[in-house]
Each structure stands twice: as C-alpha cells, then as structure tokens.
Amino acid sequence: MASESGAEKGPPTTPAENGQPGVPIAAAVAADEQGMISVDIAGLFYQFSKTFILIFPVYVLGYFGLSFSWLLIALVLLLWWRRNKGNKNSRLYRALAFLETEEKSVKHHIASIDLPAWVHFPDIERAEWLNKTVKHMWPYICQFIEKLFRETIEPAVRGANAHLSTFSFTKIDMGSQPLRINGVKVYTENVDKRQIILDLQISFVGETEIDLEVKRYFCRAGVKSIQLHGTMRVILEPLIGDVPIVGALSIFFLRKPLLEINWTGLTNMLDMPGLNGLSDTIILDIISNYLVLPNRITVPLVSDVQIAQLRFPIPKGVLRIHFLEAQDLMWKDTYMKGLVKGKSDPYGVVRLGNQVFQSKVIKENLNPKWNEVYEALVHEHPGQELEIELFDEDTDKDDFLGSLLIDLVEVEKERVVDEWFTLDEATSGKLHLKLEWLTPKSTTENLDQVLKSIKADKDQANDGLSAALLILYLDSARSLPNNPLEINHDGMKKAAVEKAKKAGKKIGSSPNPYVLFSVGHTVQESKVKYKTAEPVWEQTFTFFVHNPKRQDLEVEVKDENHQNSMGNIKIPLSQILASEDLTLNQRFHLNNSGPNSSLKMKIALRILHVEKPVRSPDEQHTSQVKRPSIFKGKQPPTPQMPAPSPAVAHKPPPTPKLETNKKLENGNKSSTPSASPKRPTELHKSSSSLSGSSFTYSPPHLPTKEPTPSIASDISLPVATQELRERLRQLQNGTTLGQSPLGQIQLTIRHSSQRNKLMVVVHSCRNLIAFSEEGSDPYVRIYLLPDKRRSGRRKTHVHKRTLNPIYDQTFEFSVSLADLQRRTLDVAVKNGGGFLFREKGLLGKLLLEINTEDAAKGWTQWFDLTEDGTRAAASS
C-alpha cells in the first residue's frame, strides 16, 4: 500500500556525513532550484580549442592559396606517426603494467569473478560431498523427471484443451551436467527447536533437450538449454520422537531465481529481442506461483494430522515501509554531450520476497520527497531481506541511482527504525526510511488502540493503513452443481437462468470451478480445477484489513467452463473477531448453489500491533546506535515495472537532526559538566540520526588511492604540545583554572561486528580555549594508532570563531574487535587558521584506549581535553 504524506513539522535537515555538515533541506532545495543547470567551463573551453585546431589549418590553406593536397599529405603523415607511436606506447604500457601491478590485476580479476557464496560468507559451508551425491544420483533423477513429464504433465496438457489432444513429448534429456549446490547454510539462531532450516545456493547450467510436438497441427517446439540460479530454502518440521524423525519437508525459493532458456523449433521466435525477456518473465511467474514465497511445496512424511499447521502458515510479521525522501542523488540527465549537467527523475523500487512496490516519479529533483507507505508480508526470517533500488526514469533505459539491502532480523528487534541510509553502489545519495515491524496477534485487546492510531474512520472501512491481517486456507469444495440447471435459482435473475439453458452442449460437460475472494477493493483468485465437482485446492490467501469491525469477506465459486456462478457466501469479519482464537475452521454452506454444496475453509484474523523493542535493559540506551548494522551492500538486479500500490494518508515524523542540535545547544549553555547525565536517554536519542545516517560504504568498483604515509607534520607533536602548555600558563596568569581547562569533547564510540568497523561520532566540543582575540576556528582530527598514514586520518569541517562547535559527524575505521584492544584512539582538537593571518595550533588532545566490551555495546560520553592526551578524565 502506498500513501502520500500531509504537512511536515519543522524545517528538516540533512544528516551529517563524513567531513560534511548537516544542511537544512529547504536551503538545499532553494539552492538546487537556483542552479538548475551547471556548465562545465573547462570542458566547454576544451571542446572549443579542439574544434579550432581542426578548422584553423583549412583556413590557412585558403588564405595562402595552397592546394588541398597539402592537407591530405599532412593528414596521412599524422595518422602514420600516431599509429607508430601508439603501437610502441601500448607495448611499453603493457610491460609496465605486468611488472608493477601484477598482484593488483590478479586480485581485481579474482574479485570480478562470480565466486561461490561460501567464499564470501563464512557461515555458508561448501558441502562438496553433497554435489558428489547428487552427481551419482543424477541419472535416476533424470528418469524421475522424464516419468513426471510423460505420466503427469503430458496428460494434463492434453486434457486442458481439445486442440492439444495430440500433444506429446518426443524427447526428454536433462543432460549429463547435474544440478550443483554452491553452498549450504544451516540456521542455528532465531529458529524453533522443532525445525531445521537450510538455505541451498543452487545452480543448474545444463544442455537440456526437451522436444514436444502437436501432431494435429504439425507443430514442433522445444528447449535446448536451461540455466537456473537461486537460493532454495528447505525446512524440516516438525521434528518428532518417532521414525522418520521429520514430520514434513517444505521447499521454496526465498526470491525469484535467475532463469535463462534457449528455445528451439517453433518456440525459437521467443529468443527474438523483446520476446526473450518476456518469455523468461512469464515462466518465472509460473515458478513463483508454486515455489516462491509465500508459495511452497510441502511433502508430508507422517499423517496429515501432524502437518496440518504446515498447510496454514501464519506470516511471521508485517513490515510497514515509510518511503519518505532522498537527498544528494546522482545526476544522470545531461545535455550537449555531458557539458551541461541536469537533474534526475528518481523513483524507487522496493522488493521483499515476491512482493514488489514502485513509487511515483519525481521530475527533475535530486532531493525528492515521496512520502509513501507500503505494507509487505514477512513469511520467513532469517533469510528474507528488504531490497530497495533507486532509478532515474528515461525514455530508453532507466539509470541506476543506488540501492540498499536491509536485514529484517535487526528490524524485528528494534520494532521501529527511522534513519537515513547511505546508498550503496552510488557516489552520493542518502535515503530516509521509517520501518515498522507489526506483529500478528490472536487477541483483540489492542484492536481499539490500533484503529485509533491508523485513524480508521467509519466512512473509510476499505482504505488506509492496515489494522489486521486475514489469512484464509481454501481446502476443498463438496457437491458442487455439475451444470447451471442444478443450481438453486432462488435469488438468481431470470435472464441468467435462460442464458444457462441455451448453453447447449456445455450443459452436459463437467465444471471447471475456481473461487474469487474479495475484501474491500482487493480481489484474489484461486487456481482452476478442471472437470470436477469435488475440487481440492489447498491454497492460502492473505488480505490486509483496514477495519475488521466493518469489513466483510465475500466468496464466490465460479465455473470457467459454463461462465456462471456456482454459489457465494458473505462472512462478516466481526464474526471472526467473536470466535475463539480469532479463527474459524469449518464447512461453509454456499448460497445460490446446490442443496448440499459447501466450501471447507480455515479463516484466521490477526491484529497488527507494534510491540516494544526486543532488547535487554542494558541495551536500552545503545539501541539507537545499533541501527546502522542492518545495512549491507548489494549489487542491484534489473528493475521491473510493477503496478504502484494504492495511496494511503500518512504524516512523516520530524527529522531527528533538529532535536540533536537543540539538545546539544542546551548542553553548551549549561555551565555544569554533569548536566547531561540527568537525561541520558535524550543524549542517546540525539545521536541516533547521526550514527545511523552517516555510515558510508565504498563500492569496490570506485577508484581508490593507495595508502601512503602522511608527510605533513602532525601539529600535536611535542612542539605543538609545548606551545599549548605555554598558552595555558598565559591564560592562567595566577588564577586557578577549572576541572577541564582545555574544554571537553563529546564522542559516541561503537564497534559493528557485522561490518567489522569502529564507528566514532564526533558530536561537539565545549569550553575550548581561544587561540586569538577573535576566538578559535576549531576542527577535530582522529587517528586510530598505530596507523598514522594519510589514509587513516579523519577530519571534521572547520567551525569559524566559536568555542562551542557542533559537528555531528561520523567516521569509520576498518578494524576487528579482537584487534581493537591493541589500538588507541588519538583525537586532537586543532585551530584551523586562516590563509594569511592565522597559524594552526593545538587546542587539546585525547588518547583513548577502547575496551572491547564497551565498544561492542557502544556508549556516548564527554571527555576532558589535555595537553598531551595522557590524562583523560571523563564525565558521562
């Protein structure tokens, strides 16, 4: 579901980045509108010079009256010289590249190869023994597949249509190359004790030959090769204390697999440009209807009573995605061959398993605001991840602007995540998301609270955010009428009865029943069961419900063969609210149908409620800092164009950056260093947007510089320390200085084990010393000792003429938690100085040895600055 927001509160600001201050969004948009198009002057001058050099010789020839042959001779000589020189240079460059960068080129080549998952992820096992087993079993697997095609699929196709009565498979050969399992992952955390969950990274590249023929029309077609790559989940549950130990086996894909098919015969036209992608998409949709979540294949190994719950899976939760806004996106639209830079027309594609949502397109804006809301079902976790991609809409092909991959396990723990995320695979850009984890509850105690929170008015029973989730399991039907004349015509129109009587030959044939379900504006359809009055579907359907007190479930059984209704029923959802455990499991008699016609269904209603975060009391103040760990990088898949979801009213929360500045300013106005401990919760909340929004990720394909030692003299060497002590004595001048004579600095320090990085957030400084009569121009420089190379240095921006600067900037250091105990954080506050009149100098220093236990939890603290950093008293 999608919605557009109403009015916003307060002027939101952009989050701080590495070395960049936060900027008000209104100011950024105003500046962006003023500079709609920026011209590359250097590029324009280069283009003009190049054109002049090409035209000027022609002018000289005409001016002196020379023959045009001179120009041709000069051109031939120039081409010969450039070709000769180019060959020599290319040989020389290849030799130098081979000698100097052999190791780098090999590493780059290995990184570009699509290696198996077990190479990149330590929790995925290679399991080569499994591939050897599959290879040994492959001939017998091929025999089973051939038997399945000939004895099951072939008769089904023949019976589907009279024109296909001569359909047959002439050749079925799966090839000699077996299915390969590139990695196996077994989940041990967040898993029920009575189940085993395995993820198999499967890959099949085979010379498969499947030929078919319809003799009646002399039509031949087939497939000559198939490639299939994807992640298949296998669930063994429930585990029982009797043979065969496992009650059932469930198999499904977490997301759509990658599929490539080469056709032959008549179907070879599907390989034509434009049709090849369409044919693969149609086949993938067919696979999704059977094998991609929420669909699955369940193989019972014990009695049906023990696995009845597997046929009626309740989703683990519902993820409400507030797709709010983005900032500093890359520009993709250019003019005059790139000399004039334009804007982008951004839109977003959100994927969760088999569910796809697309936002509206914002024209010519690098800071778009969508303010839309989507609701997606989470059927399995761990394993399912939220994928978000941004694109620039173009007439030919949409350009990629960045992507995100978010782990839903962390979102479930936090319940509500409202952060700015740095886009992956992009040179710039941030995305503002608010994620809410809604837990399905089988009680109505929170229903009134939920209805009030989503503003479920009586006149809007079918629109808006969802208050409940309806899960329906369609089992079977009994005693359906074989033809329209057997239907109980009470309540039916006379014209409909006469139309049924005129059906002629169709009256004597068996029905092809299917079921239509509708809740509000949402309609879902079951599969068609051919030539039967006792159909068995065993399908599950889910509906989002806005107001269960006022909405109804409408069910209608229809006959595809006779094109008529076979019965209907209307079930008020309030009836389910009054039932035990909010569940109905019974046979429902059909109206306007046969005398004994009924549907067997199991219907459950679950109230969607946001629970409190799942964390211990010790983690309550550090939960905000933990949020960036849910971000991971990922290569973007090819975008699809799904239909946009319906709009729902939504009002975005104010940007937390404003609260940060206000709280820190209040802290600066206070003269007591212990003012902040009175409200530790606010202090950690103020740093949430900073720690969550400024974490950057360097894509592997972007150019990076080799680390080189810093040749610039470090100002916090003994000479600078002596100057600082002298300045401190001058300030003292016979008076007694306070507890922190050089001032204090506020830092948030946390280590992310998932990303293997140390995050340091520089919030602010207070009560710094004045470097001159006009004050100081302070900035903060950070090293993680013993690394003092230029590449290991981190710097904030410079604040002019202030002794209480506010930075709110986040920096990252790549270091493991085990190695962190041997490292020291070197923080120096320095005076930036001017170009001619001021000199740089040291304002204070801090040397901090980080405890690994504290770093894993994360903490925020004020630290005293000293002359050499060795005496570091701290206040909370």
Curated annotation (Swiss-Prot):
Binding-site residues for Ca(2+) 1, renumbered to this chain: K332, D333, D392, D394, D399
Region (Disordered): 1-21, 614-714
InterPro entries according to UniProt: C2_dom, C2_domain_sf, C2C_KIAA1228, Ext_Synaptotagmin_C2A, Ext_Synaptotagmin_C2B, Extended_Synaptotagmin, SMP_LBD, Synaptotagmin_SMP
UniProt topological domain (Cytoplasmic) ranges: 1-35, 81-876
GO biological process: one example: endocytosis
Highest taxon above the source species: Eukaryota
Keywords: Calcium, Cell membrane, Endocytosis, Endoplasmic reticulum, Lipid transport, Lipid-binding, Membrane, Metal-binding, Repeat, Transmembrane, Transmembrane helix, Transport
Domain SMP-LTD residues, every copy: 123-302
Membrane topology classification: Peripheral membrane protein; Multi-pass membrane protein
Protein name: Extended synaptotagmin-2-B
Summary of subunit composition and partner proteins: Interacts with fgfr1 that has been activated by fgf1 binding. Interacts (via C2 domains) with the AP-2 complex (via an alpha subunit). Identified in a complex with the AP-2 complex and fgfr1.
Biased composition (Pro residues): 636-656
Region Required for phosphatidylinositol 4,5-bisphosphate-dependent location at the cell membrane, residue ranges: 788-795
Lumenal side: 57-59
Alphabetical list of SUPFAM superfamilies matching this protein: C2 domain (Calcium/lipid-binding domain, CaLB)
Binding annotation for Ca(2+) 2: D333, D345, D392, E393, D394
Domain (C2): residue spans on this chain: 301-421, 446-592, 741-863
Biased composition (Low complexity): 686-698
